[in-house]
Amino acid sequence: MEKIESYFVPFGRLLLAVIFIMAGASKIASGGAGMIEYMESAGVPGILFWPAALFELIAGLMILVGYQTKLVAFLLAGFCLLTGALFHYVPADQTQMTMMFKNFGMAGGFLFLARFGAGEMSMDNRASSED
C-alpha cells in the first residue's frame, strides 16, 4: 500500500491543476470572447481578464509540477473563494450554488497543499534535496 500511497499527492495535484490549465488555455485561445462581458456583468473589470487567464494557466502548471507549491496553492485557494463568491453565488440557481461549493471544495484542497506542500514527486522536493 505504501507504494500506491506515494502517488496520492502527485495525482491530487494533477486533479487540482487540470481545471486551471484547461480553463486558462481555453480563455487565452478565445481571446476573451464572451468572458470579458461575463466578468463585467459580475462587477469585475474586464481588464482583469488577461491577468486572470494567465494566472490560471501558469498557476495550474506550477501545481502540476510541484513548483513553489505552498505559495501558489495559497493564491489559488483565494482565487477559488473569490471567484466562487463573485460568479456563482446565485441562491435561486442550484447549478450556480453547486459550482460555488465546488470552488470552495477546491480551495480546501489547495489549503492542504499550502500547508503540507507538494510531496516527494515535485520540483519543490527535488530542489530541497539538492541543497
Q: What are the language-model segments listed below?
A:
Residues M1-S30, E37, G46-L54, I58, ...:
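Extended, low-polarity transmembrane helix blocks
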